[in-house]
Structure formats: C-alpha cells, structure tokens
UniProtKB/Swiss-Prot annotation:
Transmembrane segments: none annotated. Possibly the antitoxin component of a type II toxin-antitoxin (TA) system. Its cognate toxin is VapC21 (Potential). It holds the Pfam family AF2212-like. Belongs to the UPF0165 family. It comes from Archaeoglobus fulgidus (strain ATCC 49558 / DSM 4304 / JCM 9628 / NBRC 100126 / VC-16). InterPro entries: AF2212-like, AF2212-like_dom_sf. This is Putative antitoxin VapB21. Keywords: Toxin-antitoxin system.
Amino acid sequence: MPKIIEAVYENGVFKPLQKVDLKEGERVKIKLELKVEPIDLGEPVSVEEIKKIRDGTWMSS
C-alpha cells in the first residue's frame, strides 16, 4: 500500500523526516513532488499570459 512521507534531499541522499518502517537494504520507489510556495504577482494574470510564459514567447511582445 502506498505511503506518503516527507523527506529532505541532502548530499545525494533522501532523508525521511519521520520514522519509516522498512528493513535495511529494502528497495522502494520514490515519486518526487516538489513543495513550492505560490508567487504573489501583485496583479491578476490572464491564462493567455501564463501560456506565453510557459511557451517561452512572452519576451516577443
């Protein structure tokens, strides 16, 4: 059964932030999901503007 835990990546190693019930040497699959904070742009941004930024065409206007 999948279990979600938080971990920190330091010196090339994922370090769990809580106790993990695993045997030494046991293999697991890790799905990475970066924790990000929202950016306050100070004003509303349209979907079209977001698409331009995503597509890299925002500098051409």
